[in-house]
């Protein structure tokens, strides 16, 4: 506190400090003016006042002055006091305006008298632009903006700039003269309608409303001139169209009068000089014209629908594509069949030439075996069905197994095993067997393997059928029932009735042989012939000798057939052989022989087909009959005459390791030796 009081005491009195004007802003950038302002001050100013730190206001003033320099603002006029922040008084402002208008009038009158009208370059620059020198239009504002400075405002000063680029000056002069000729006015300045509405300078706010009126007047003038120009263009277009067609006529007549050499020269010239789209259009038009009138009419319709794409080469491609699609027709000649018209088509019948061959799997015998079995005996079957209705196979729950097994056996058969008698009663399968035989003969290396595979499948089906036949005996063995019926009714039947029953027995025996082969151990289809031939050959003796067999023996054989379906045919053949002996020797021998053959056949379950010559010639099929096809590889190369002479040790050396298989083979060998086939 004492120091502060001492400082106040030592400070000079306020009366000694002279009064100076209050400065609201920091001193300007100009150092000379700053020195003058400090020189005017008395010497009693404290030291260090001139070198004081620049304040924030001083920095703002510096930025403001640089901004005014960039915006071309005249803030440094000579009439202003540098240290004075307030605007000048009214007298100074009026004097400066009078001096500016006098100088402007003098310069404009001098320029108009000395130079032509088109050489004057108007400008929109503010009066402050004069301080930047004579190169404002070319250097500072640039060449592109110097042409936009024209204005017919009488208040704005018209200054004369000496541009560096003389070519740009001549271009501006030409633009002024052309604008003058178009607008029809005598003013040497550019029209305001072609200029953008450019904002005025900062200090020039005078006569802005009059300028808008002038722009509206010039716009109305240009609109009226545009309407008149449009009318004249329409008239010229009509004249040009008439001239165009007349020129086309003259050009076509000129082409017609040219010689061939000149025509070639003209075409070469046009092809080398015309644009590509015109050449493509001409090519498409020429192709459509050469194709005919219908295509040309379609082309004209499409060109009327799409007039904007006429000259486009892509539209021509599209039109060609559409034309080709329109030509596509279902009844086109290129898609018709090449077969000639047949006489069957006129009668709406199936044409046998065009008919596709039916597949072999669609054979009626495969799905309906009754058709193939009875087509030769249809009359006898019909007469017998009226008295004794047959049991239909379709009632059996395993009816599909018969068809499957029969089909697999037919596929396993080769060409050597196709018999004529079998095809006689199965004509629907004769073509199938022959075609399969041809295929097997062409493929001899894999024939046996295919037979084994198909036979194995047939074995599975036959075993299932055997189990089903044990459950349904009345369905499985219809032949035995029919034989019993014929045996019981043979005593009272008249001769003509016996003849009818003989035909029915032929059918029943054949059906029995089919069932026997289907339910056995995969017997190939060739065995049907031997089965039927044996049964058919013995039927002649049945007519005379079946009356001597009593009903008790028939009942016994019927039970054995049910229990053992595999021995059904052998029992039947034994009975028929007994009948043949009873016709010559008497009834006593018949009873003895019947019991002997019955006991012998019942003791051995070996099928009688093992002695068939055709099976013996085909060892794989013979082994399949015995259900020993697993030893096919061991025994297939041994002839049957040597095979039946083998003993137990030789079979074991051949590869038959199972004792049961060797015993079964030895039994089969004995059967073959007892019933040697006739070679």
From Swiss-Prot:
**Where does this polypeptide localize?**
Cytoplasm, Cytosol; Cytoplasm, P-body
Return the Gene3D superfamilies for the record: Transcription Factor, Ets-1 (1.10.150.50)
Compositional bias segments (type: Polar residues): 1-17, 30-50, 79-89, 179-213, 563-573
The processes (GO biological process) annotated in the record are:
nuclear-transcribed mRNA poly(A) tail shortening; protein transport; single-species biofilm formation
User: From start to end residue, where is composition biased (Low complexity)?
Assistant: 90-100, 214-239, 530-554, 574-604
Task: Describe the task this protein carries out.
Answer: RNA-binding protein involved in post-transcriptional regulation through transcript degradation.
Give the protein family.
Belongs to the VTS1 family.
Per its record, how is this protein called by name? RNA-binding protein VTS1
| Species annotation | Candida albicans (strain SC5314 / ATCC MYA-2876)
The taxonomic lineage of its organism, from the top, reads: Eukaryota, Fungi, Dikarya, Ascomycota, Saccharomycotina
